[in-house]
């Protein structure tokens, strides 16, 4: 029953926003996301102690990997919905959005959260595919929320490219299903994760290779991996800041969760060699593209979007190593990246509302003029660049250690070279935005405490996880063994 409740909570929040159309209803939606996080933590503790939970007559299943992703979704959706209250209030007050569209925004955000939760709780690869497709449909409208020419172009580009990716993922899923049927699986259970992993040794290797390649290419589109990554900077730069936080902070990793699930099946059938080679190629290509594009970036929201491509490349490279240490580090990286990136996108929304531009050269002396926003933005970039004490520092070290253990040291060195280029590029952009002397009348009032508090809390959580990761160690260990038994 608890898994059904987790799915119902964001839908109840959306119903409250749709039915009441009141400011208080938006805070009720925030509360439902907080309850989702709390239930996710409870499920995680329960699963680590007693094993997987099932629900909805076997349609839903939560093992350690699913429970971890529910916690990530709950945390990021809580941050995004909290700041979303302010975002919509400012847009309505400024005449950029009607109350009706603000209501639609609130409903769509809650539907988006519900679809992501369904994706990670699905016991069936077909339900997973439907849920990921649902995230595409919902977020198309969220990307185009402002209805400007740029927003509409970005939403159409997102729809077309991600639809191609989802179609490829569908064909890959069908091939895996056909493999399971030919291996003697029952049609009713051939799509279940547990059945696929248990019967992996009997799957046709050649068909499975093609199926997994299509899955990586298809779901990799939603992850933002090369080659079908071009939708990501446009969508992230045009969407409202809370939507960008949800997309970059958690949607990308929900799609990567699907790749991890199929990787477990493929490795059980073929060994780790095939998936390792494929993921290394995709990862290093993504890192190279992110490094080259960040050097010439002029828009700080697009800068953050390209940084997402870098981090998804690092996650893919860590997953390529495939051993439990690597998968645990990947999951720690997913959580740290989600917290840091969501805080940065939410802060960028505040900066854009205050400065009236998203261009890097249009913002200066933030630390002096707007010390709260400048401090949060600068600290968030420190976290995102993988510097201590934040959790991304720990996860990147652990991934590199695992890569050297399995003979991928050369790939880790190549990734480090790309990261150095990215570090130099981002520091240069941040220097322009954060430093400088303000004019005599340019020191402005900080945002309200209720706006700054969740931003600071997200960064504090990212730092604490980097220093005190032991509360998560049992969950990370159990989740890693789901992918790499």
Language model features with spans:
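Membrane-water interface of alpha-helical transmembrane segments
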Residues: 23-30, 57-70, 99-106, 202-209, ...
């Amino acid at each position: 029953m608890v898994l059904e409740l987790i799915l119902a909570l964001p839908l109840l929040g959306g119903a409250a926003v749709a039915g009441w159309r009141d400011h208080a209803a938006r805070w009720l939606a925030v509360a439902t996301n907080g309850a989702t996080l709390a239930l996710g933590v409870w499920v995680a503790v329960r699963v680590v102690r007693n094993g997987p939970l099932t629900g909805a007559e076997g349609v839903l299943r939560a093992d350690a990997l699913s429970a971890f992703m529910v916690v990530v979704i709950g945390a990021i959706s809580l941050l995004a919905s909290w700041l979303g209250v302010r975002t919509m209030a400012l847009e309505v007050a400024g005449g950029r959005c009607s109350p009706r569209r603000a209501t639609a925004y609130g409903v769509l955000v809650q539907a988006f959260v519900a679809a992501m939760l369904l994706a990670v709780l699905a016991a069936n690869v077909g339900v997973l595919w439907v849920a990921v497709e649902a995230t595409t449909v919902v977020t198309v409208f969220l990307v185009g929320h402002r209805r400007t020419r740029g927003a509409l172009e970005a939403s159409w580009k997102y729809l077309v490219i991600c639809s191609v990716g989802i179609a490829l993922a569908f064909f890959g899923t069908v091939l895996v299903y056909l493999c399971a049927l030919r291996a003697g699986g029952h049609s009713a259970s051939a799509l279940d994760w547990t059945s696929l992993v248990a019967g992996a040794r009997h799957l046709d290797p050649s068909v499975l290779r093609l199926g997994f390649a299509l899955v990586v290419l298809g779901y990799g589109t939603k992850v933002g991996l090369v080659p079908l990554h071009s939708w990501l900077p446009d969508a992230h730069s045009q969407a409202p800041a809370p939507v960008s936080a949800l997309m970059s902070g958690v949607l990308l990793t929900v799609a990567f969760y699907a790749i991890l699930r199929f990787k477990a099946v493929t490795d059980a059938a073929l060994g780790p060699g095939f998936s390792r080679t494929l993921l290394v190629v995709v990862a290093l290509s993504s890192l190279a593209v992110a490094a080259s594009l960040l050097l010439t970036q002029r828009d700080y929201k697009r800068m953050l979007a390209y940084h997402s491509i870098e981090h998804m490349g690092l996650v893919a490279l860590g997953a390529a190593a495939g051993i439990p240490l690597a998968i645990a580090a990947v999951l720690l990286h997913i959580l740290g990246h989600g917290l840091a990136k969501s805080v940065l996108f939410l802060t960028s929304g505040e900066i854009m509302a205050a400065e009236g531009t998203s261009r890097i050269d249009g913002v200066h002396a933030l630390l002096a003029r707007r010390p709260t926003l400048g401090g949060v933005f600068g600290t968030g970039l420190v976290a995102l660049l993988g510097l201590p004490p934040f959790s991304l520092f720990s996860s990147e070290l652990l991934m590199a250690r695992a890569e050297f253990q399995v003979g991928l040291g050369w790939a880790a060195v190549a990734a480090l070279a790309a990261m150095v280029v990215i570090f130099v590029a981002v520091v240069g952009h941040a220097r322009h935005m954060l430093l400088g002397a303000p004019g005599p009348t340019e020191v402005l009032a900080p945002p309200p405490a209720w706006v700054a508090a969740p931003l600071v809390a997200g960064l504090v959580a990212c730092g604490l996880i980097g220093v005190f990761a032991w509360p998560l160690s049992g969950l990370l260990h159990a989740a890693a063994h789901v992918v790499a038994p």
